[in-house]
């Protein structure tokens, strides 16, 4: 699996991923020698800038009035946790998490598929509704994976969790537009959000682990 990135605009350092991908890159080079000039399949991955936090109490169980009171009571907390979530699970962390997964295998793409991490798309209407390709590539074997949501929730009964939404677009049929395979994954959190600065590292590791599990839940369903 070859890994590329076009995220220079947001300054992502991919050194660790490059080291991890080295054996696979060697395999790709060796494979190319035996398969000739065969065109590799392409997977383009788009992380998201979307981040939301939602804290609710037992008030939400008392209809609209309770939900309104609950939202008002937790407004400041939700804003601060959303800001932290956007920073802690921003594009470079999403890429780090996805870099630990064999995306080609999980998405059932051909061996030797090149993986390119693209810059996030700010317009949600494009990322969630556009059925055409989001890059200029005209490769006949082409697919896209988009992360479209990171949602942190804290509920009075169920506790804390991270939920993510993904979209997979497979253009291998030769169509200019394709179906958007949408889905989600959700897993519990133990350390996020951190209560002190000493807990920041554990909280961010908690988020990354949950994000990875969420993707594997999604990929298993497609």
Where does each model-flagged region fall?
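A structural "domain/chain start" motif
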Residues: 24-112
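Structural alpha-beta junctions
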Residues: 110-115, 168-176
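Bacterial N-terminal signal peptides that target proteins for export
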Residues: 1-11
